[in-house]
Amino acid sequence: MEPIYPFARPQMNTRFPSSRMVPFHFPPSKCALWNPTPTGDFIYLHLSYYRNPKLVVTEKTIRLAYRHAKQNKKNSSCFLLGSLTADEDEEGVTLTVDRFDPGREVPECLEITPTASLPGDFLIPCKVHTQELCSREMIVHSVDDFSSALKALQCHICSKDSLDCGKLLSLRVHITSRESLDSVEFDLHWAAVTLANNFKCTPVKPIPIIPTALARNLSSNLNISQVQGTYKYGYLTMDETRKLLLLLESDPKVYSLPLVGIWLSGITHIYSPQVWACCLRYIFNSSVQERVFSESGNFIIVLYSMTHKEPEFYECFPCDGKIPDFRFQLLTSKETLHLFKNVEPPDKNPIRCELSAESQNAETEFFSKASKNFSIKRSSQKLSSGKMPIHDHDSGVEDEDFSPRPIPSPHPVSQKISKIQPSVPELSLVLDGNFIESNPLPTPLEMVNNENPPLINHLEHLKPLQPQLYDEKHSPEVEAGEPSLRGIPNQLNQDKPALLRHCKVRQPPAYKKGNPHTRNSIKPSSHNGPSHDIFEKLQTVSAGNVQNEEYPIRPSTLNSRQSSLAPQSQPHDFVFSPHNSGRPMELQIPTPPLPSYCSTNVCRCCQHHSHIQYSPLNSWQGANTVGSIQDVQSEALQKHSLFHPSGCPALYCNAFCSSSSPIALRPQGDMGSCSPHSNIEPSPVARPPSHMDLCNPQPCTVCMHTPKTESDNGMMGLSPDAYRFLTEQDRQLRLLQAQIQRLLEAQSLMPCSPKTTAVEDTVQAGRQMELVSVEAQSSPGLHMRKGVSIAVSTGASLFWNAAGEDQEPDSQMKQDDTKISSEDMNFSVDINNEVTSLPGSASSLKAVDIPSFEESNIAVEEEFNQPLSVSNSSLVVRKEPDVPVFFPSGQLAESVSMCLQTGPTGGASNNSETSEEPKIEHVMQPLLHQPSDNQKIYQDLLGQVNHLLNSSSKETEQPSTKAVIISHECTRTQNVYHTKKKTHHSRLVDKDCVLNATLKQLRSLGVKIDSPTKVKKNAHNVDHASVLACISPEAVISGLNCMSFANVGMSGLSPNGVDLSMEANAIALKYLNENQLSQLSVTRSNQNNCDPFSLLHINTDRSTVGLSLISPNNMSFATKKYMKRYGLLQSSDNSEDEEEPPDNADSKSEYLLNQNLRSIPEQLGGQKEPSKNDHEIINCSNCESVGTNADTPVLRNITNEVLQTKAKQQLTEKPAFLVKNLKPSPAVNLRTGKAEFTQHPEKENEGDITIFPESLQPSETLKQMNSMNSVGTFLDVKRLRQLPKLF
C-alpha cells in the first residue's frame, strides 16, 4: 500500500510527521536553512525570456471566422480555440490555434460566451471586421479588456486552482479583411497580456530530503508525472533537522505550514515555462500563510528532472524582491494573410507568427496605464482588507468554513471575466456611432479627422481610442491615469518612440521575422504612426475608385515581395506638424534640410493626399524591393525631380522628396518604368499626379480650408456631412490628378525632369518598363528580359554591376551611361517592331571589357547590311533619319563608345550606370532632340576619365589601353557612319576632331586602367558576358574588337598570362570534334613563337575559328530555333544555322577580330606591316582587320555568302572611310602587357585564346571562312581536357 500513500490524504496524514499523532515542527531558527553556495551559473525564468511565444494558426480557422462574420452581416465576435504547449527544448511556448467557436449568447452576459470550452482549451476572443477599412494600428484591447485580463491573471495566480500556463497568457485577436475578386487579404492583430515577473535561479548543493512515499515515488522510474503524462509540482517545508519535506499541491497542510519552496517533476530543464508558472503560484498564492526565504530572499526549487536520476536543487530569487507585486507585459503581433477564396485550405502550412514585447504603440500606452490603475486598486484593496479574497478559499482549510463558500473555483473566474468584458460590443457600438462629439480630440487628430472625415469610420485603431474617450468620462479608472486619446496626438507630435511600432504596417512574417534589423530601423520616426494610417485609409476610401482601378496588382504581393526596407510599411508615416513631414523611415538617413520656400509650399494635407494616393499601391503591392537605402535615395531623387514642378525648383524638390517625403520611397513602386510591377499597371503617366500635391500650393489651400471650416462645424463627431466631405475630397483628388497630369505633360520635354519623358513615352512604355524595371532594381544578377529582348537586349542589365557596389557620383559619367542604356532601351523597343534588325551593340552594350561598343556594332551592321540598320539605331533612325544610324544624336556615337570605354574598361562607370538606371529612359528622349555638341561629349568623357583616374590604382602598365580602345571604338563608330551614311561625313570629321582631342587629353593624363576595384568590376562584367555568350553569340561577339580580343589573347602570349578560361574550354570541348581539338592543340604549340606579324595572320584566320565553333550543327534544335526566333541567327541562306553561340571568349574574340578586319579592310596591304611596335596588339588588330579586308569582314557565317558579299561591297565601296578611320588606331600603342583588361583568373574567359593563327595568309581568310572544318590556333587541347566540363 505504500506506493499509494502519496495519493491518499488519510494515510499521508497518519504517516507524516506532520500528522496529528506526530507533531511537526519547523526549525526554530529561520536562518541558514540550507547551504546557499552556488554550484553553477544562474538562469532566468520567464515565459518569453529565451524565445517569444509562437502562434501557429490554421488557415481553416481564419476562413471559418471570416465566413461567420460575413453571414452575420456585422463585425461579429467569436472565439478561436487552441492549446498552449511548451516547446520540446522548453525554452518557449507555442500556441496552436486550430478551432473556431462562434460562441453563444447568454441572457445575463453582454458578450457571447464560448459554446463549450473544455479543460486545457486556450480561449481567444476574436473580432472580425468585414465591412470597413480598419487601421493597421488598431487597438485590440479596450480599457475594459485590459482590466478584465489583468484581473483574470491575478485570480488564476492567486487561486488554488490547478495551475495552467495557458491561463497566464490572455490573448485577443482582431481580424480585418479586404476582399477582391478571387482572394481575401486578412490583417491579424494579436495582443496578449501576461505577467512580467521573472526569477533568477542558481544551482546549489543538495539538501537532504525526508524519504516519504512521495519523495521515493518522485525518485523512482515510474513517478507520478510519468504515469500521468504531465508535470507535477508541490511545495516544500522543513522539519527541525532542516530536511526537506515534500507536500502535494493539494495537501491542505500546505496552507498552514511555513513553506520554503517548491518541487517539480516531469520537467527536463529548470528554465521551462512551467517552472516559471509554479514560481509565480508559490509567490502569489493567497492561500499560503507563510513563506520562509533565505537571508538573501531566495526560496528552494527541487527539480526531479526527466534526464537526471537525482533531484537538482536551486535557489530561486524573485527579481522583484522578497515581496513582489504583479507586473504585466503586453505582447503583440501583426500579420497579413492572403488567401484565395475558392481554394481548399491546406492544413500542412499553418500561419506562423510571434508575440513580441518590442513594439511601442498606442495600445502599449493604454496597457501601461491600465496596469498602473490595476496595481493601485490592488494595493488599496490590500490596505482595506486584511483578509485574502474569499474566492481564493475553496479548499479544505478549516478556517475557511467561517466564510461563505463560493461556486466551485474554475468557473467563477471565467464567468467573472466574461462579465468584466463587455467592451467588445460597447466598443463596436461606439465606433459604429462614429465619433463621440462630446469628447473633442486634440488638435492634431482634429486636423486629421477634418481632412479625412470618412476615415474615422474605417480606422480600426481609432476604435480602441473611442472607448477610452468614453471611459475618461465615465470610468473612475481613467481618473487614475487611464489611457486616453490625448496621449496619442501628443506622441504624434513629439517624436515619441512609443508609437514607433505603428510603422510596422501589416508586414508579412518574412519581413518581421527575417529582418528584425529593418524593423528596428523604422523605429526612429514612429511618432507619425497612427496618423498616417488614417490618411492612407482615407485615400483608400476617398480616392478608392481612382486608385484602386489603377492598381489591380495588390492581392498577393504582400507576403511574397515585402521589401527589406518595407516602404509600404510607412503609410502611417504621415504628419501633423511640419517637422514630421511624412519622412519615410528608410530615408531617415541624414538628408539636406528643406529649402524654406519648399517647406512653405508643401501643404501637409496635400502631402497626405499624395502619400495616400500611393500608399494603397505600396502597402498592398509590397512591391518596393529596394536593395539599399542608397539606391532608394538615389532613385527617389531622380524620380522626384519631375513630381514637383510647380511648387519649387526641381533640384530642391529632389532633395525634399528624398529627405522628407514618403513619396520618395514610393515612386519605385509607383512609376511604371521603375517598378517591378510596372508592366501590370496601365500607364506610367497615370500615377505621378498624386506626387504633384507636394509642391502644389493651390490645391493645398483648398484642402486645408475646407476641412477646417467643417471641423469648426463639429466634423469631429463625424456628422451626417461626413460623406459630403468625402465626396468633396474625392473631387479635389481628381482635380489634383488632372492638374498634375497637365503639369507632367507640359514638363515632359523639359530636361530638368528627364523622367517625365520616359513617363510620357507611351509608345515605348511597355518595353521600357520591363527593361528599366529590371535595371532599376539594384540587383546585380542576370535579369533576363521578357519577350523579344530576352537574349538580344539583355546586355544592359547583364553587364551592369550592382548599383550599390561603387556608385560614381560623377553626373556626367552617369549621363553618358544613361545615354548608352537609353540606346539599349530604344533597341529593345525596336526589336519588337523591326524583325529584320539583328542584335547589335545593344545586346552586348556593356559587354565585359569589350571596349568597342560601336565597333562591334559596325561589324554586325556591316554583316547585316544597311537595310538591317543596327538594332540599336533602328528606333533612332526612324525618329530622326538625319542622325547616324547608331545614335540618337550625332554625339552619342563617340560619347557612348567612350563611355563604354571608361565604363567596362574602368569598371567604375558600369556601376554608375546601374545607380542611374532609372534615368535611362528619360535621357533617351532628350537625346533625340539634342543637337550634336562635340565639346559636351568631350567634356563628359574627360570627366569620366578624370573620375576613373582618381579612383584607380597606380598601375601604370596600362596607360594607353583606354586610349587605344577608345580610338578603336571611335574608329569603328566612324566606319559605321561612313558605311551607313555618306551624308554624315562632315559629322564624322567633327568626331575626328573630338576624338583626337580626347585621345590627346587621355595621353596627357596618362590614363590608368586596371585598378583593383576596376578589376573586380571587370571580372563581374566578364562573368555576365560569359553567361550571355551562351544565349546570344552576337551579344558578346559583336561587342568585341581586335583590341579587346587582343587583350584577351595577350595574357596567353605573355609568359605570365592566365591560360584558357574554363568556360571557353568547356564550350570548346562540347562543340569541337577531335580533329578540331587536335588542330587547336597543334597550332597552339607554335603560338608562343609568334611575332606580331604572325599574330596578325593568325588574327585573320581567327575568323574561321568561330565558324566551326558557332556552327549550328553543334546546337540543339531548340537552341537553333531560339536563336532564329530572336534574330540571333540569320534565317537567310540558312546562315543562321551556321552561327551559334560559341564560347564567350572565342566567339567574342573572333568576332571582334572580324569586325576589326572589316572595319579596317583597306589596310590589306598594311596587313603585314603592323604598327612599328611589335608588342602592340593594335597592330595585330589592324592587320587582322586588314587581312579581312580582302576577305569579307562578314561574321563567320559559313553559308553567309550573301552577307559576305554584302560586306565586301560595303568595304569596297567605302575603303577610304575605313582606312581613314583606321589610321588613328595604329598610332596608339596598346602594349600587350597593358591590354589585359581581364587579367583576373575569373576573367579567364579571354585567357589564352590565341586569336591570330600565324599559318594562315590573309588571302586565305575567305576560303577558310567558307570552309566549315577549318579551325585556327585557338585552344590548348591538353589544357582543355584537364579542365572540368561546365555543361
Swiss-Prot record:
InterPro entries: Sil. It is found in: Cytoplasm, Cytosol; Cytoplasm, Cytoskeleton, Microtubule organizing center, Centrosome, Centriole; Cytoplasm, Cell cortex. One of its GO terms (biological process) is neural tube closure. Pfam families: STIL_N. Keywords: Acetylation, Chromosomal rearrangement, Cytoplasm, Cytoskeleton, Developmental protein, Disease variant, Intellectual disability, Phosphoprotein, Primary microcephaly, Proto-oncogene, Ubl conjugation. Induction: Down-regulated when cell proliferation ceased. Accumulates during G2 phase and falls at completion of the cell cycle. Residues 1-1018 are annotated as: Interaction with RBM14. GO terms for molecular function: identical protein binding. The modification N-acetylmethionine is found at M1. Expressed in all hematopoietic tissues and cell lines. Highly expressed in a variety of tumors characterized by increased mitotic activity with highest expression in lung cancer. Disulfide bonds: none annotated. Homodimer. Interacts with PIN1 via its WW domain. This interaction is dependent on STIL mitotic phosphorylation. Interacts with CPAP. Interacts with RBM14 and this interaction interferes with the interaction of STIL with CPAP. Forms a complex with CPAP and SASS6. Interacts (via N-terminus) with CEP85; this interaction is essential for efficient centriolar targeting of STIL and subsequent PLK4 activation. This is SCL-interrupting locus protein. It comes from Homo sapiens.
